[in-house]
Structures are given as C-alpha cells and as structure tokens.
Amino acid sequence: MVLKVPTSKVLLVLATLFAVAAMISSWMPQVAASPLAPTEYEQRRMMCSTGLSDVIQKICVSGTVALGDVFPNSFGKRRKRDLQNVTDLCCKSGGCTYRELLQYCKG
C-alpha cells in the first residue's frame, strides 16, 4: 500500500532541507586554496664564510666529499672539474637548501 502525500508537504520538506543546508554551509569557514610553505629542508638560505662552514660541520657528521673522492684518477691529468663548489651554490642570492648541502657530505 502506497501512501499518498500531498505535493505541497513534499515541497515544504524539500525547501526546509535546502534552507537548513544553506545555513549550515554559511556557518562553516570557507577554505581557500593556498600554496604550502616549503618544509625546513626545502627552504633556501644564503650562507657564506663561517656560517656555511658551521652548518656543514653540523650536518656532515662523517666529513665532506673531497675532489679526490669524486675524481680519484685525475692526478696529473688536465681535466675540467664540473663539480660546483658549495660556496658557489650557497653564497649567492639564491642560496641553497639543506638537501643540496647533503650532497657534499660523505656517505
């Protein structure tokens, strides 16, 4: 057996539900999209001189990579070394990140 509900009551219930939903959505804070801030490891910082040296000594516990480690058979040979110096990277206006500094650490 199917109940017959007057159309006006159905419309009244739907209108009430719509009004309640509209009020609830206006109470909730609107979320705006914004870019995420870079993590501590990805923030670029300009470091030079003793400041850069101190940071490298703190993060490179087992020491830094020497050019002899990178180019073991280059003694006596003329070869352009394309490895960028850490000061070339960090002591310029762009600065460097923690992850980039880790490339200069051993192991």
Curated annotation (Swiss-Prot):
Keyword Nucleotidyltransferase: no
Gene3D superfamilies the record matches: Insulin-like
Tissues expressing this chain: Expressed at a low level in the larval gut.
GO molecular function, one term: insulin receptor binding
Propiece residues: 67-76
UniProt xrefs under InterPro entries: Insulin-like_sf
Transmembrane annotation, as ranges: none
UniProt keyword annotations, A-Z: Cleavage on pair of basic residues, Disulfide bond, Secreted, Signal
Biological processes annotated in GO: cellular response to starvation; insulin receptor signaling pathway; positive regulation of multicellular organism growth; response to starvation
Compartments in which it is found: Secreted
This protein's GO CC annotations: extracellular region; extracellular space
Chief location of this protein within or outside the cell: secreted
First and last residue of the signal peptide: 1-33
Superkingdom in the source lineage: Eukaryota
Cystine pairs: C48-C91, C60-C105, C90-C96
Function text: Possible ligand of InR/insulin-like receptor.
Quaternary structure, from the entry: Heterodimer of a B chain and an A chain linked by two disulfide bonds.
Family to which the UniProt record says this protein belongs: Belongs to the insulin family.
Name by which UniProt lists this protein: Insulin-like peptide 6
